[in-house]
Swiss-Prot record:
The keyword Ligase applies. One of its GO terms (molecular function) is ATP binding. InterPro entries: GCL_type2/YbdK_subfam (IPR050141), GCS2 (IPR006336), Gln_synth/guanido_kin_cat_dom (IPR014746), YbdK (IPR011793). Residues 392-413 are annotated as: Disordered. GO terms for biological process: modified amino acid biosynthetic process. Belongs to the glutamate--cysteine ligase type 2 family. YbdK subfamily. Disulfide bonds: none annotated. It comes from Bordetella pertussis (strain Tohama I / ATCC BAA-589 / NCTC 13251). This is Putative glutamate--cysteine ligase 2. ATP-dependent carboxylate-amine ligase which exhibits weak glutamate--cysteine ligase activity. It holds the Pfam family GCS2. Its EC number is 6.3.2.2.
C-alpha cells in the first residue's frame, strides 16, 4: 500500500475557495468567458489565485492562508475588486450564489484542460450539469491522523453548513423548493457522500483509497467528492458543502464559524458510530428545508435544525472570543436568525421583481458590494431582446391560482 504524505499545517489556520458565476451583463444568463477573463488577469499579482473550472462559465477564486478571518476578509475584498475590474474590461459580470437560476446545462462549454475533458468524457451530461458553485473552506491540521479526526468530528455539522450557506433555490428557471439544489448535482457522482465510518485514522484512510484505486474506482483523492475530505498536499481538512455566498463578507463569516467549530470539536469526545445513522436524512433536510429542516442529533434526538444551530452559536461564543472572532460569529448569527439564508433572500428578490434575470442582476450587485438597486422589468426585457439568444421559459413553481411558492422551504417546520 502506497503511503500518502501529509504536509503539516499550523492548527486553526484557514483559507477558502469560491466558485463564481460569469454572466452576460445584458441577458444575465451565464457567459462562457473564463478564458477571456483569465487572459485579462494574466499579468496581475492575483493571477495565480484565479483558476478555470469545469465549464467556461465559471472561475475559482483562491485565498492565501490566514490565521484570522479578518485578514481573509481583507484579501477577499481586494481580490473581488480586482476581479470585477477585469470582468468589466472583458464585458462580463461576476456573481456568487450556488446555482444560476435559469441556465441550461446543454449550453455549457467544457474548459479545455486534460482533467476537465476527461471528466466530460467519463460522466457525460453530468459534467455540464456540474455548473454549480460552491465555497470550500480549508482548516489547517498538523497530521493525517488529526485530519481524519477532524473530518469525523465535523461531519455531524454538515447540515449546519448547508443551511447557513444555502443559496441555490432556483434551477433551469423554476423554484426547486430546495434551499440548496446545488448538492443534488454533486451527489450524482459515484464517490460523493461522506468518509466511511470505519476510517478512523490516516492508515485506514490510505488503505481505503488504495482499495478504491486498485478496484479502478478512483485514481486519486481528487475523485473523492466527499462533503468533507482531507487535503494532504495542503495540510488541511476541506469542507465542501457550502454554496458560494452572495457576498465575500458572508463567505468569511462562514470561514470564521468553521474555524471556531474546528477548535470546539477538537476538544470534544469523538462522535459515536450512531452519529452516522442519520447522515443522509440530515443532509437532505438541510438541502430541502434549509434552517427549518429537522435534525437528528448524534445521540438520536430529533430537533429543529434552527434550534440546534442557535444552541451551537451559544456554545461556540467562548471559543470565538478566544480566537478574536466573536464579532464575526455574532454578525452571522444575528443575520441568519433575523433574515434567513441567501436562498430566502433570493426568493424575496423574485417576489419583488418577478423576473429571474433581474434576480441575477441583484446577485451581481451584491457581489460587488453595491447593494441592490431597483431596475424596471422593462429594462431587463430590452436587454434580453438585444441578445442573439433571448432567455425563455423563466418561471417559478406555482399554486393552481398562480401564486409563487418561494416560501415553502422556509415554512414547513
Amino acid at each position: 500500500m502506497e503511503q500518502i504524505p501529509f504536509v503539516s499545517s499550523a492548527p486553526n489556520t484557514l483559507g477558502i475557495e469560491l466558485e463564481l458565476q460569469l454572466v452576460d451583463p445584458r441577458s444575465f444568463d451565464l457567459a462562457a468567458a473564463s478564458d477571456e477573463l483569465l487572459a485579462q488577469l494574466a499579468n496581475h499579482p492575483i493571477a495565480d489565485r484565479v483558476k478555470p473550472e469545469i465549464t467556461r462559465s465559471m472561475i475559482e477564486l483562491n485565498s492565501s492562508v490566514h490565521e484570522h478571518p479578518a485578514g481573509l476578509l481583507a484579501e477577499m475584498r481586494e481580490m473581488r475588486d480586482v476581479l470585477c475590474e477585469a470582468a468589466d474590461a472583458v464585458g462580463v459580470g461576476v456573481t456568487g450564489g450556488g446555482a444560476h437560476p435559469f441556465m441550461r446545462w446543454q449550453d455549457r462549454a467544457i474548459s479545455d484542460t486534460p482533467r476537465f475533458q476527461y471528466l466530460a468524457e467519463m460522466y457525460g451530461y453530468l459534467a455540464r450539469q456540474f455548473t454549480v458553485f460552491g465555497q470550500h473552506i480549508h482548516l489547517g491540521v498538523p497530521s493525517g491522523d488529526a485530519a481524519v479526526r477532524m473530518v469525523r468530528g465535523l461531519s455531524p455539522y454538515v447540515p449546519h453548513f448547508i443551511a447557513l450557506s444555502a443559496a441555490s433555490p432556483y434551477c433551469e428557471g423554476v423554484d426547486t423548493l430546495f434551499s440548496c439544489c446545488r448538492l443534488n448535482a454533486v451527489n450524482s457522482f459515484p464517490l460523493a457522500g461522506h468518509m466511511p465510518a470505519d476510517v478512523t485514522d490516516w492508515y485506514r484512510f490510505e488503505a481505503h483509497l488504495a482499495q478504491l484505486c486498485a478496484s479502478g474506482l478512483a485514481e486519486s483523492i481528487k475523485d473523492l467528492y466527499w462533503d468533507i475530505r482531507p487535503k494532504p498536499e495542503y495540510g488541511t481538512v476541506e469542507i465542501r458543502v457550502c454554496d458560494t455566498p452572495l457576498t465575500v463578507e458572508r463567505a468569511c463569516q462562514l470561514a470564521a464559524f468553521a474555524q471556531a467549530l474546528a477548535v470546539q470539536v477538537a476538544r470534544d469526545p469523538e462522535p459515536s458510530q450512531q452519529a452516522w445513522l442519520a447522515y443522509r436524512s440530515n443532509h437532505f433536510q438541510a438541502c430541502r428545508f434549509g434552517l427549518h429542516g429537522s435534525y437528528v442529533t448524534p445521540d438520536g434526538q430529533r430537533v429543529r435544525l434552527v434550534d440546534h444551530l442557535r444552541a451551537l452559536f451559544e456554545r461556540l461564543a467562548p471559543v470565538a472570543e478566544e480566537l478574536g472572532t466573536g464579532d464575526m460569529l455574532q454578525t452571522l448569527r444575528d443575520e441568519i436568525l433575523r433574515n434567513g439564508n441567501d436562498a430566502r433572500w433570493l426568493r424575496g428578490q423574485f417576489l419583488k421583481v418577478r423576473e429571474l434575470p433581474l434576480v441575477v442582476e441583484s446577485m451581481a450587485q451584491n457581489w460587488r458590494g453595491q447593494g441592490v438597486q431597483d431596475t424596471p422589468p422593462s429594462a431587463v426585457r430590452r436587454r434580453i431582446r438585444a441578445t442573439s439568444e433571448p432567455v425563455g421559459g423563466v418561471c417559478a413553481l406555482s399554486t393552481p391560482q398562480g401564486d409563487p411558492l418561494p416560501g415553502w422551504a422556509e415554512r414547513l417546520h
